[in-house]
């Protein structure tokens, strides 16, 4: 019974993570409901599993502390007259509670090497299929998502995402899995070739998306993976592997030929009319004004779209729903206290994650943790210029990867209740 419930939990987490991107990134109300209800159902299954066992074993995670403190901060904002818009804070609190549940359950479920390896392979297969769909839609598409749904967003759509940068965010988190599996010593050579091919195709679609922040984050990922994988070893092999991957990627890009990619980067040098065509820097400047007015606890979780128009320094007939910088938006909505907890989360993520990856080459579980840590790195870098953590599908995957990167596989680390 317990084993069956364990399988249900692991499969359920993977299905929820797979559902989000296919549902246009999980940004619509019905998709958010599925994510929240699915997370609650999985928590109930875990509780039933605990009742069926003679004792409940809970695997601790260092990130539980900043997450619980952050939950307490949001709970304080739900008190009367604490949030600029109580309902928006409540809605976002429910969504992030779902992320917290997925984080907790992932820590409990994915603690054995075999399950971690399966998760890494599942991410590879899923990412490859989504990438192939995106390439097909790019070259034989009709301007509609899934060839059926018109794109009403202002941004270019790629794959199932209405925003090309959010598609890049998904691939940033998934590409490290085939990359690490291709470099690991436990994979046979034919499988390494397949993993390498999947990584090249998935990586090429980041360039196909023409997301400048995504391309920069992907480049940082490759560099970080090269450095982390070479810890305690000769670096020549890791550098050669990274160089070979880049050459294969360039060859793939020559075949795919993303139209307008160079022009996208050339736009960075264009003069900006802050009054009518603001840049992300303008959004950040306006957001910092908001922080100065409520520096301690912020305006309320999820209230940025409501409060920002009062501080906007430019004219637009479009709704500005995010700061295009997740860290700045965190400071706006939860103040310096929430920002400090976010920094603590990132610090503990890397301190704990880097302590786990010493023997990644011959341990499938540790190699998956390495890939998860690199995936989190990519999204964190991208978050300086975009709002991927405001996209439910990407945020849910980020927190699951954080759980895998920091979770313990040691039997002695569990606590009994």
Locate predicted features:
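Alpha-helical transmembrane segments of multi-pass inner-membrane proteins
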Residues: 1-3, 7-26, 33-47, 71-78, ...
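Juxtamembrane membrane-water interface segments that cap and precede transmembrane helices
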Residues: 20-26, 80-81, 148-160, 278-282, ...
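Membrane-helix interface linkers and caps
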Residues: 50-60
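A short secondary-structure junction motif
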Residues: 79-82, 142-143, 226, 294, ...
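Extracellular loop and loop/strand-boundary signature of outer-membrane beta-barrel proteins
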Residues: 89-92, 271-273
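Flexible juxtamembrane loops connecting transmembrane helices in multi-pass membrane enzymes
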Residues: 156-160, 218-222, 253-286, 292, ...
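TM-adjacent membrane-interface loops and short helices in multi-pass inner/ER membrane proteins
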Residues: 163, 281-321, 327-330, 334-341
């Amino acid at each position: 019974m317990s084993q069956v419930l364990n399988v249900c939990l692991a499969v359920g987490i993977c299905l929820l993570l797979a559902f989000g991107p296919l549902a246009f990134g999980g940004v619509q109300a019905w998709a958010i409901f599925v994510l929240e209800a699915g997370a609650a159902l999985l928590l109930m299954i875990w509780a039933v599993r605990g009742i069926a066992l003679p004792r409940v074993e809970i695997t601790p995670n260092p990130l539980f502390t900043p997450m619980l403190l952050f939950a307490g901060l949001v709970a304080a904002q739900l008190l009367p007259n604490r949030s600029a818009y109580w309902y928006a804070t409540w809605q976002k609190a429910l969504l992030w509670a779902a992320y917290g549940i997925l984080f907790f359950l992932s820590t409990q479920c994915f603690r054995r090497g075999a399950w971690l390896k399966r998760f890494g392979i599942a991410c590879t297969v899923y990412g490859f299929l989504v990438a192939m769909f995106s390439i097909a839609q790019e070259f034989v598409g009709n301007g509609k998502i899934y060839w059926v749904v018109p794109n009403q967003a202002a941004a270019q759509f790629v794959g199932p995402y209405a925003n090309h940068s959010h598609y890049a965010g998904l691939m940033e988190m998934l590409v490290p899995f085939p990359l690490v599996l291709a470099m690991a010593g436990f994979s046979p050579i034919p499988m390494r070739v397949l993993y390498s091919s999947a990584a090249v195709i998935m990586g090429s679609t980041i360039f196909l998306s023409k997301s400048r922040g995504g391309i920069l984050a992907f480049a940082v990922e490759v560099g970080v993976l090269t450095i982390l994988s070479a810890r305690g070893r000769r670096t020549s092999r890791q550098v050669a592997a990274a160089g070979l991957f880049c050459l294969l990627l360039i060859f793939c890009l020559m075949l795919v030929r993303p139209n307008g990619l160079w022009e996208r980067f050339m736009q960075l040098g264009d003069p900006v009319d802050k009054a009518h065509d603001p840049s992300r820097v303008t959004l950040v400047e306006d957001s910092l004004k908001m922080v100065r007015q409520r520096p301690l606890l912020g305006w309320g979780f999820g209230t940025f779209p409501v409060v920002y128009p009062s501080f906007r320094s430019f004219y637009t007939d479009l709704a500005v729903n995010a700061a295009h910088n997740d860290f700045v938006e965190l400071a706006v909505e939860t103040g310096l206290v929430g920002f400090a907890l976010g920094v603590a989360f990132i610090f503990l993520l890397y301190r704990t994650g880097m302590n786990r990856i010493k023997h990644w080459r011959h341990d499938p579980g540790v190699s998956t943790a390495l890939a998860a840590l690199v995936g989190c790195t990519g999204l964190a870098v991208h978050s300086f210029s975009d709002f991927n953590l405001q996209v439910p599908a990407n945020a849910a995957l980020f927190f699951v990867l954080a759980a895998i990167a920091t979770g313990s596989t040691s039997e002695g680390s569990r606590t009994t209740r």
